[in-house]
Amino acid sequence: MSLETLPTLREALEAHGLWAKKAFGQHFLLDLNITRKIARLAQVGDGDVVIEVGPGPGGLTRALLETGARVIAVEKDERFRPLLQEVADAAPHLTLVFGDALTADEAALSAGRPAHLVSNLPYNVGTPLLIKWLTGPWTPASLTLMFQKEVADRITAAPGEDAYGRLAVIAQATADARPVMDVPARAFTPPPKVESAVVRLEPRAARPSPERLDALQKVTAAAFGQRRKMLRSSLKALGGEPLITAAGLDPAARAEVVPVAGFLALADAWLARREAPATAAPRGR
């Protein structure tokens, strides 16, 4: 059997008695025209290593295999093992891994080779997976990922936009992020109640150090935890006005208008304050 002679996705689902599980945030993308477009947007080809999370019935998997890429598909739902094994039998360059992507070791999966992440992510784990990939020790070659439209907007938002927040800062501090494709709800089975979008992220060559990323997460959590307040109030516990002025920012500004570079400067200022030796208090006479 080859990819061309496999049953259609709907036929495969029916043959195995499979359906989407709400608990796993599953919505199946069965239109091969759309999955092939996503594979093109991923810019992968012959011999490239691709990690796909949540392949489900394998629609995007098939499209990626058609490019000649070597696909490592990570699936949590054991129900799909027989169906995906049929795809693997037809495509020797597909490797199946059953387990939780949140705890997966991508460096081990890819055997140390550069790997691209291409996935129609389950809605309920998309954001934590993205944070893991952008801030963890392993750096992907690129990420082409589908999210709920609202999450995609939060990843790519600019300062001053309603969707701009902590996720945008972390994503854009570590990667060049841009929306590349909208996908209507009707394209999925079952149709979700929201629209979806594909985001393309290319990790920056000079990614912030782990210490700088930890500091960035700390200052963004404080700043956006009270996003309507001035920085002098929201960052009071981290150093207040001295911290903010050390970063070259206006203490009266609000988090929603501070650019990514400003938050990186805040992270640097917080690290500098933390590492500075404490000044001894003068002794009384």
Swiss-Prot record:
Function as written in the Swiss-Prot or TrEMBL entry: Specifically dimethylates two adjacent adenosines (A1518 and A1519) in the loop of a conserved hairpin near the 3'-end of 16S rRNA in the 30S particle. May play a critical role in biogenesis of 30S subunits.
Subcellular locations according to the entry: Cytoplasm
Gene: rsmA
Disulfide bridge positions per record: none
Protein name per the record: Ribosomal RNA small subunit methyltransferase A
Family in the record: Belongs to the class I-like SAM-binding methyltransferase superfamily. rRNA adenine N(6)-methyltransferase family. RsmA subfamily.
One of the record's GO molecular function terms: RNA binding
HAMAP family hit by this protein: 16SrRNA_methyltr_A
Gene Ontology cellular-component annotations: cytosol
Kinase listed as a keyword: no
EC number: 2.1.1.182
Family matches, as PANTHER family: DIMETHYLADENOSINE TRANSFERASE, DIMETHYLADENOSINE TRANSFERASE-RELATED
Residues reported to bind S-adenosyl-L-methionine: 27, 29, 54, 75, 100, 120
Primary location group: cytoplasm
Enzyme category, top tier: transferase
Gene3D superfamilies reported in the protein's UniProt record: Ribosomal RNA adenine dimethylase-like, domain 2 (1.10.8.100), Vaccinia Virus protein VP39 (3.40.50.150)
Keywords: Cytoplasm, Methyltransferase, RNA-binding, rRNA processing, S-adenosyl-L-methionine, Transferase
Ligase among keywords: no
Catalytic activity: adenosine(1518)/adenosine(1519) in 16S rRNA + 4 S-adenosyl-L-methionine = N(6)-dimethyladenosine(1518)/N(6)-dimethyladenosine(1519) in 16S rRNA + 4 S-adenosyl-L-homocysteine + 4 H(+)
